[in-house]
Regions:
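Acidic, proline/glycine-rich short linear motifs
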Residues: 28, 37-63, 143-147
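Short, hinge-like loop/turn segments at secondary-structure boundaries
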Residues: 50-54, 98-100, 122-124
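Short secondary-structure boundary segments
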Residues: 37-38, 107-109, 138-139
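General small-molecule cofactor/ligand-binding pocket signal
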Residues: 36, 80-84, 135
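Structural beta-alpha unit
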Residues: 70-104, 141-147
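Glycine-rich, Arg-bearing micro-motifs that act as flexible, cationic patches
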Residues: 106-129, 143-146
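Intrinsically disordered or low-complexity boundary/linker segments at protein termini
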Residues: 1-17, 128-147
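Small/aliphatic-rich secondary-structure junction motif
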Residues: 1-49
Length: 147
């Protein structure tokens, strides 16, 4: 169970809450991790159609993924990375299926109706469409996984 976990990262502080939980779970279960970040800016969304080069933001996102993966690998975990481009919910679900992940891990920000209308909700879309279990960790809540 949970041989490959897709970990959706935001390249932000919320990841600091998620990663300790997921790395602990991966060690307990012997799971592989697939870190994904979905670049969704203009350049990312039009990358293929216009033959664009990676934007500064996309280069920074790739560096962040590789750095985070390196830290987790140093801790003894098997980690791959994926920088996707486009609509975050669609790319998360497509990548999870493509790589045969059996768990998706994400952070939730605890928005309510108004916040979701302004910010959108990747989680809402993913949880309604996913056929794979989802583990949600509340961002910004200081916690440590059990030892």
């Amino acid at each position: 169970m949970y041989k490959k976990i897709l970990v959706a990262l935001e390249n932000g502080r919320a990841d600091e809450t998620l990663l300790p939980h997921i790395s602990h779970l991966a060690r307990l279960l012997g799971s592989e991790l697939l870190l994904i970040h979905v670049a969704d800016g203009w350049a990312a969304r039009n990358f293929e159609q216009l033959g664009l080069a990676e934007s500064e933001e996309m280069i920074g996102d790739r560096d962040y993924l590789e750095s985070t993966a390196g830290t987790l690998r140093t801790g003894g975990l098997h980690v791959d990375v994926c920088l996707a481009r486009g609509n975050p919910p669609d790319e998360i679900l497509k990548t999870a299926e493509q790589y045969h992940c059996d768990l998706i891990a994400m952070t939730t920000h605890g928005h309510r109706l108004f916040g979701d209308l302004i910010h959108g909700s990747t989680i809402t879309s993913v949880r309604h469409k996913s056929r794979i279990p989802i583990l949600l960790v509340r961002a910004g809540v200081p916690s440590t996984p059990p030892s």
